[in-house]
A protein has these predicted regions:
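Mid-chain, well-packed structural core segment of small domains
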Residues: 65-102
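ASCE RecA-like P-loop NTPase motor cores
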Residues: 1-5, 27-29, 43, 81, ...
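Glycine-rich phosphate-binding "P-loop"
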Residues: 1-16
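Short hydrophobic beta-strand segments
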Residues: 5-8, 33-39, 86-88, 105
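Short amphipathic alpha-helical segment that frequently serves as the phosphate-/nucleotide-binding helix
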Residues: 17-22, 118
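Trafficking entry modules
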Residues: 107-113, 117
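Short, well-structured hydrophobic secondary-structure segments
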Residues: 20-66
Length: 142
C-alpha cells in the first residue's frame, strides 16, 4: 500500500519548491525515481530552474513532462511510467496516486490550498493509508 507523507511549511510556493529540491535529491540518493506534480506551467518552469541551480556539486537529472527520466516535472493529468515517488503540489489528489510506492503532499501558506490539503489528509486517513506528518513550519522558513 502507498505510504503518504505530509510536510507543512510556514512559507509560500517558492519555499515549497525549495523543499521539493531537497526531497528530490534525497530520493535520488536512494535510486528512486520521482514525479513532481505541480499546479501549472509557471511552477514547472520555476522548479526546473531551481533543480538546475540547487546543488552545484551534483547534477539532478530531470525534465519537464512525464518522460521516463529520474525526475519528471509535470502539471499534466498523466503519470507516464513513474511509480516510485510522487511529490504532489497540486491541491487535489490525482486519481492514479495509488500506483506510487510513496506520495509526498506539501502544505504551504495559502488558505484554499491548505484546506484542500486538509481534505486530502482526511481522504487518505479514511481509506487506511499509512500517514506521516512533518511540521517544518519552525525549522524550514523563508
Amino acid at each position: 500500500m502507498t505510504k503518504v507523507s505530509f510536510y507543512k511549511l510556514a512559507g509560500d510556493q517558492t519555499l515549497a519548491l525549495t523543499l521539493v529540491c531537497q526531497l528530490v535529491q534525497k530520493s535520488l540518493a536512494t535510486n528512486q525515481q520521482v514525479l513532481c506534480l505541480v499546479p501549472d506551467n509557471r511552477a514547472a518552469q520555476q522548479l526546473d530552474e531551481m533543480l538546475w541551480a540547487f546543488n552545484g556539486a551534483s547534477f539532478v537529472p530531470h525534465a519537464q513532462g512525464v518522460d521516463h527520466v529520474p525526475v519528471a516535472i509535470s502539471f499534466d493529468e498523466k503519470p507516464g511510467e513513474h511509480h516510485q515517488v510522487l511529490i504532489n503540489l497540486q491541491a487535489q489528489i490525482p486519481t492514479w496516486f495509488s500506483r506510487f510506492e510513496r506520495v509526498i503532499e506539501i502544505i504551504y501558506k495559502q488558505p484554499d490550498y491548505e484546506q484542500a490539503k486538509r481534505d486530502n489528509f482526511r481522504f487518505y486517513k479514511e481509506r487506511g493509508y499509512q500517514l506521516d506528518f512533518h511540521d517544518l513550519s519552525e525549522r524550514f522558513k523563508p
